Curated annotation (Swiss-Prot):
<keyword id="KW-0067">ATP-binding</keyword>
<keyword id="KW-0547">Nucleotide-binding</keyword>
<keyword id="KW-0028">Amino-acid biosynthesis</keyword>
<keyword id="KW-0963">Cytoplasm</keyword>
<dbReference type="GO" id="GO:0009073">
    <property type="term" value="P:aromatic amino acid family biosynthetic process"/>
</dbReference>
<dbReference type="Pfam" id="PF00288">
    <property type="entry name" value="GHMP_kinases_N"/>
</dbReference>
<dbReference type="GO" id="GO:0009423">
    <property type="term" value="P:chorismate biosynthetic process"/>
</dbReference>
<protein>
    <recommendedName>
        <fullName>Shikimate kinase</fullName>
        <ecNumber>2.7.1.71</ecNumber>
    </recommendedName>
</protein>
<keyword id="KW-0808">Transferase</keyword>
<dbReference type="InterPro" id="IPR010189">
    <property type="entry name" value="SK_arc"/>
</dbReference>
<dbReference type="GO" id="GO:0005737">
    <property type="term" value="C:cytoplasm"/>
</dbReference>
<feature type="binding site">
    <location>
        <begin position="86"/>
        <end position="96"/>
    </location>
    <ligand>
        <name>ATP</name>
    </ligand>
</feature>
<keyword id="KW-0057">Aromatic amino acid biosynthesis</keyword>
<dbReference type="GO" id="GO:0004765">
    <property type="term" value="F:shikimate kinase activity"/>
</dbReference>
<dbReference type="Pfam" id="PF08544">
    <property type="entry name" value="GHMP_kinases_C"/>
</dbReference>
<comment type="pathway">
    <text>Metabolic intermediate biosynthesis; chorismate biosynthesis; chorismate from D-erythrose 4-phosphate and phosphoenolpyruvate: step 5/7.</text>
</comment>
<keyword id="KW-0418">Kinase</keyword>
Amino acid sequence: MARARASGGLTIVNAIGHGRLGGAAGLGLWVESRVREARGLWAGVSLTPRGERRLPPRVLEAAATAACSLGACVEGLEAEVHTGFPPGVGLKGSAALLASLVEAVLRLKGVRAPPWRAALAAARVSRGAGLSVTGALDDHAASLLEAPVITDNRGMAILRLLPRDGCRLTAVIGVPGVENPVENLDPSPFRRHSRLYDAAARLGLAGEWLPAMAVSGVAGALALGVEGLASRLYEAGAAAAGVTGKGPAVFALTERPRGAAEVLETAGYEVVEARFKWCG
């Protein structure tokens, strides 16, 4: 059995709202996949904080397709996935799942590939597996690389690795009891705020990814109608706050995590805290 892990993260630029560019930064929240070859069988389970879930065969087949494009071909897989954070809430869990499966298959077959190539291979198959709307190259790259990224999700290109900043900040994340699976996503509320996402993308490409995250987060909060909560997080000292990804999770980046946690707990959210993964 081979194993590999990939990280969850936060949105820098929401590619659903922008329409082309995306950005993400990895957190110290992990998904670990353990795989073995099982000819003719595509089966697995994902163990999450919200219980055990069956992995759809299409997800395992997509991971195998991506790995085979890098020279690691299998005719079937059994997998056990351990997810250390709630899935389906905008914390890049789907990308971390697929990326970790691809990396695990590469290790199973003894094939070495740079993380950026594994991320690209995973992103190319993610839409067909029902794991993303845009291909989510930003999320897959952030899950495997040790730096924040800006990507062209339509052109499938990593445009920029960003400075590894943010180590004085804690990500305080409010997770509601409901999920927002990809198959139920309505992109139109996000696309109504495309000008804000354009501004976030310009900031990100200039290397100013923390301000970009702030702009994108507020745009997401407007899209989902939680701008009042984002405002309260700023009042509590957040450097950036809003909705991450497709939501419904709400985040604050702050040097005062207790204050942000109290705001989120008062609003009825479960609180998860993490730091950027390059910060140790």
